[in-house]
Amino acid sequence: MIKMLEGYYIIENPGVVPAERRFRMKDLKAWGYDLHLGTIEGERAYFISKTGERHEGETYIFKGKEYHVSRTQKEIPENARLLARIIIERGNPYLEVWLEEEDVKFPLTKEDPRIILKRIWEKEKLNQLLKHVRAVGLTTDFYKDNVFTQGIPLPYEEYPPKVRRVLREVKDIHRDLTGFGRFVFQYFGEVDKMHNYRLYWTLPTLHLFDIDIANEVDKVLGMLD
């Protein structure tokens, strides 16, 4: 849904925020983890450790349990799925990650998503996301204020081609990548060859753990700089 309301250009896809999502090995790597096959207390299991921290053949104790690394996976096993979801407990968000192998579920981690997102964005140099994030829960809010000279926001018909291209990119992200989102935009023209604008963008947090989607969102946030 697209509408213009009192100087605000709004792109809204009011779909359902997904309960869980499938991820790839490249995403897990971007989060800063290795995936291992081995044993926990002698029972076959998949588990994770920080990148490069554990090695094949190593046995160690973590939180009172004995872990043995038989193999460090290069890919997600063909008969398994890497899944994650955002949950809210006592007002705080958590990212739960697990591996499903047929009917068996192997819990991998439960962490504050803000910590992992910050780690990803710093590692991948996604500076727009780092700078403009405002809130993280089931959804994540970004706010960017590039208003140098306050005035009356322009109607869509007066937007220059570069601004319209940004709006098309936002529509594509909502339609093709996230299925949900709300983008609110005000444009005040150019000042000294710099675009004068303000935006608010809400996206499902879970999708931002997909490194390709995170890169696309970061790119769009920086297109008018």
UniProtKB/Swiss-Prot annotation:
Name of the protein in question: UPF0128 protein PH1314
Domain of life according to the entry: Archaea
Family: Belongs to the UPF0128 family.
Lineage of producing organism: Archaea, Methanobacteriati, Methanobacteriota, Thermococci, Thermococcales
Naturally occurring in which organism (per UniProt): Pyrococcus horikoshii (strain ATCC 700860 / DSM 12428 / JCM 9974 / NBRC 100139 / OT-3)
InterPro entries per record: UPF0128 (IPR005266)
